[in-house]
Amino acid sequence: QGVLKAGQLGHGTPIGSHYTPDAPGYVDMTAVNAHDPERARALLKEAGVKLPLSLSLTVPPPPYARQAAQVVMAQLAKVGIQCRVQQVEWAQWLEGTYRNHDYDLSIISHVEPLDLGNFTKPDYYWGYRSPRFDALYRQLVTAVNEKERLDLLAQVQKLLAEDCVLAWLYQPHWVSVARKSLAGLWDDMPMLVNDLRSMRWVS
């Protein structure tokens, strides 16, 4: 909630896997890796991590990333992880973080819809490799029965959460402000654009 408040002024829904709450088949996975500093310290000890651990947190220009980074840095410090926030421009983020995988931590909003296929690409910038996920995803994209597809979606979300591939934070709510006489605005935004063809002024 602290990250959501800092990054989006509270306008968002916490998520625990790589799927949005408004999509068919969504399963709430926020409890799988809930905020728990005590458990985090125990896991670090179990993994044999020597504290304090120093990491860099690379963030692109948008305010959601740079403001949230301060909260993430403070929260990690409580479990013995010292973060140095590195603010970069988009070109640097794309070249260093995305293309060359040169980063410890980063904060980014994934806006591409239904991009679960990226988890089948071991060379993608988060470097996830899972034969089990690959098999589930192949079944998912070829499923024709809706019940089977929803069941596979649930399994995929659960596996990603349990594997801790990413630390999912929230699905942002994009707030639009318009005159009362403007009709045709989308109630839900499948992408970050406004379809001007559907808009019109009404009396």
Outline where the language-model segments fall.
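Structural motif corresponding to alpha-helix initiation and N-cap regions
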Residues: 37, 90-91, 154
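Acidic/histidine-enriched alpha-helical segments
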Residues: 55-56, 84-98, 174
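Immediate post-signal peptide segment of exported/extracytoplasmic ligand-binding proteins
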Residues: 37-56
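DNA breakage-rejoining catalytic core of tyrosine-based enzymes
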Residues: 29-35
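Short glycine-rich hinge loops at helix-strand junctions in the catalytic core
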Residues: 80
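Detector for C-terminal structural segments
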Residues: 1-27, 63-73, 94-203
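Short, well-ordered beta-strand elements
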Residues: 51-61, 83-86, 104
